[in-house]
């Protein structure tokens, strides 16, 4: 694990295997660093705000991205989106395109929700956020596939959530350990991103048992990486 201090943002870095990079940072640190003082949003607010490029200390969003942000109905969604975009753009610029301006690094989404770089669609990337953290992953090998998820660990979910998110076999293995429940959940969601289907695939068709993934009862040959952050967050990556 390493750290990059950039514009008063502490960016934590991981490399679970050669060629794969994970960055994660706190959303409040990002917002304090990217907005001009007089334009900093009130994070206690609920309704959305209409942002302009000049609200940011240094432009890093395109006009199209500003329009996307202003289409969201909740400020929380806007802030998560802005923070995630800032982190992954910094990552891509730092690792791949040091001479490219941040507002020229743009992402789009495939039909079922998987993100990709518009100018380099074959470069593997993945995004996630939860509460105070946003995370991004990329891979130097264009032939690899990755999926990333981060979640805040709360109390053990209720019975309805457990039966919706996990199979009976998974529930028997998980017991009532909140940390392991959320860890398995991040692995499952990371795998759904890995196959580029997200929640378009049934949660009951994917099982995580003893750190192994089964899809339609077939064991999947993938690498699974998980780590706990600040004792109350867990981050997982699924890769080739």
Q: Where do the protein language model's features map onto the residues?
A:
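Core catalytic alpha/beta fold that binds nucleotide/phospho-ligands
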Residues: 1-240
């Amino acid at each position: 694990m390493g750290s990059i201090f950039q514009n008063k943002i502490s960016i934590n870095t991981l490399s679970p295997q050669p060629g794969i990079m994970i960055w994660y940072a706190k959303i409040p640190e990002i917002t304090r660093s990217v907005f001009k003082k007089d334009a900093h949003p009130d994070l206690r607010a609920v309704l959305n705000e209409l942002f302009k490029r000049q609200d940011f200390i240094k432009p890093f969003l395109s006009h199209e991205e500003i329009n996307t942000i202003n289409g969201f109905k909740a400020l929380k969604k806007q802030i998560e989106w802005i923070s995630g975009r800032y982190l992954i753009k910094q990552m891509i610029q730092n690792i791949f395109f040091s001479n490219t301006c941040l507002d020229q690094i743009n992402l789009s989404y495939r039909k079922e929700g998987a993100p990709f770089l518009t100018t380099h669609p074959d470069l593997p990337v993945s995004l996630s956020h939860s509460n105070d953290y946003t995370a991004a992953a990329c891979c130097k090998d264009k032939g690899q596939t990755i999926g990333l998820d981060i979640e805040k660990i709360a109390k053990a979910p209720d019975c309805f959530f457990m039966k919706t998110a996990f199979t009976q076999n998974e529930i028997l293995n998980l017991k009532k350990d909140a940390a392991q429940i959320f860890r398995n959940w991040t692995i499952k969601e990371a795998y759904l991103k890995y196959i580029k289907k997200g929640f378009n695939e049934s949660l009951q068709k994917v099982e995580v048992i003893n750190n192994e993934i089964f899809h339609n009862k077939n064991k999947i040959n993938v690498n699974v990486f998980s780590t706990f952050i600040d004792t109350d967050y867990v981050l997982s990556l699924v890769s080739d």
